[in-house]
């Protein structure tokens, strides 16, 4: 955890700074989970109310029925986004592409590390 004020906490994974709601003790260690259904993908950088926007590499694409799980990597951060097959086709996403990963500060679920 880098900073926590006004019910907004910033934390770092590798060199990537992310934001979540809630109060945490600065310099504390936490675990982070973001549900794949909460992650939005965009080809271009967009102006949005979402606090978290990461430029990531598409590592793998797994088709599951009418959905697609897009496996993403940026620095030490690994994420999976679940999108519809139609959206994947419209965005023309392929392994090796770089894409913007977007999620709101309310999306990450943080787990406090016990001492």
Region locations from a protein language model:
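A structural signal for short hydrophobic beta-strand segments in well-ordered beta-sheet cores
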Residues: 1-2, 58-61, 72
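Conserved active-site beta-strand-loop modules that form the wall/rim of enzyme catalytic pockets
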Residues: 7-9, 28-29
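Short, acidic/hydrophobic/Gly-rich beta-strand patch recurrent on exposed beta strands
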Residues: 9-14, 33, 69-75, 82
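Glycine/charge-rich catalytic "coupling/switch" loops of P-loop NTPases
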Residues: 15-61, 82-115
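Short, conserved beta-turn/loop elements at beta-strand boundaries and strand-helix junctions
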Residues: 3-8, 61-67
